[in-house]
Amino acid sequence: INKINLNTQNFFLINADWLSCFKNDSFDLILSNPPYISQNDLHLKDLTHEPKIALASNESGYSDIKKITQQSSKILKRRGILMIEHGYNQEKVVKSIFKDNYFSDICTIEDYQAHPRVTYGILNK
């Protein structure tokens, strides 16, 4: 692992079910790039440099996004911000997931090809 190879001391690794290891009301901002490709996506066979687990998620690519959003609504401080990268065709569903988990002021940022790529919202509970 690069942490060992580079003798890096300024970060640590945590093995957890996404955000489950953190206390409630711990963060002002969470930024995530979770797996968001459907397990059945034909493009996965062409991606040889990344492990499938880093790219693909169950429930048509939404399983990890749902879990992170649900957990974020507990560990973010009030008015905290959640930002999640997602597929270009997932904006509508991701916004719905945010709304279902007490996020408001939900917006999406486009990538350099003008595709919806990152959705963010403010925790409002």
Regions found by a protein language model. Give the residues of each.
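S-adenosylmethionine
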Residues: 1-124
